[in-house]
Amino acid sequence: METIYALSTAAGRAGIAVLRLSGPHARAALRALTGRKAGAPREAMLCRFRDPETHAALDRGLAIFFPAPASFTGEDVVELHIHGGRAVIAAMLRALGQLPGLRAAQPGEFTRRAFENGKLDLTEVEGLADLIDAETEAQRAQALRQMEGALGQLYEAWRARLMRALAYAEAEIDFPDEEVPGDLIAKLGPDIEALETEIAAHLDDGRRGEQLRDGVEVAIVGPPNAGKSSLLNRLAGREAAIVSDEAGTTRDVLEVRLDIGGVPVTLADTAGLREAAGAIEQEGVRRALARAEAADLRIVMVAPGVSGIGNGFALARPDDLRVLNKVDLGAEVPDGVIGISALTGQGIDALEAALAARVGSAYEAREHPVITRARHREGLADCAASLARAEAALKAGRDAELVAEDLRLAARALGRITGRVDVEDLLDVIFRDFCIGK
């Protein structure tokens, strides 16, 4: 096994940089750079780092040794905390490259070794990646729960129940002469039904976890000159869109990223909806309608004296936020409509509060684990389909072999999500529960 090394902190100038080594030669590399043995595990040691060939001083910093298996990767790990100048980092990386048995790590290789050594399952690996990429508080909370194992533990608990059911089925098939009740297959029905119900409820989540991870899309739609671009600028706090009295100024979808109540939101300003005269504006209207249809939430905006496709709120859906702009001109605000002035800022606080309440209630991070990736959903769907077949086979009185095969497929589908499929753990369950071979 090779020892790998890499810069663990972001590239560029900084006060501190951290280099990480992992593998059997990590301890020897530390001695080659410092002329000293590794200190006590997990204790910082002040060192002078030298070039292993010329012995020229490179930097002065801290070294920390994490012996296997109590480390991130499960291998011997060394962290070198050095000054974050580009020249210092480059010199230290060159020095590490001179040492035998060391090579530069590939992207994600430290985390891959952590997975291969059983320190993380795949959902925890994905949670770690999401935590690094988190931009908002809700994203951070969701990613941290997943990184700490909440999602993987749920799937492993379901898989353990499946393995137990499979063990009963296999026991009846493979050990007919042992003291195993003959009606075990019939007793599996309630357990399978309970698992089906729990997995179905988990799948029926409105894709909230995926949307929170990727961001919620909010589209501003309405006729030309309703003030959509002005509202985008007001909510963004900057001049992101061109504002003009000329109708049809916005011809493509303009996006800004916002943090609303801890939830990442992509706010999209769309072309004004009207019977466009030119081909370019017609394409803008087509894109606006498509974007509005695909959005998770829409702000339907109108203003006095403007008209377009679906005058007023004719295009509004029941869950849309309805906004009347230019109330500073004295327009009456109907019930269920938020009155604003994108020009003066009047009513913007009320709109932001309504938007935060709508987004927050639907997409805030939940206490229970949620699906965060399409592959999780696909694996759960495969598991549910196999369970449905197993239940149907039970009710039809088919052979135990058919039931066992579907239970096995269901367990493997869950195991693929966490990356811990193990064909040997079936025998462990059988011996523990039935004392076969005793």
Swiss-Prot record:
UniProt organism field: Parvibaculum lavamentivorans (strain DS-1 / DSM 13023 / NCIMB 13966)
GO biological-process terms attached to the record: tRNA methylation; tRNA wobble uridine modification
Subunit and interaction comment: Homodimer. Heterotetramer of two MnmE and two MnmG subunits.
Predominant cellular place of this UniProt entry's protein: cytoplasm
Stored HAMAP family: GTPase_MnmE
Protein name, entry field: tRNA modification GTPase MnmE
Binding site for GTP: 225-230, 244-250, 269-272
Gene name per UniProt: mnmE
Signal peptide boundaries: none
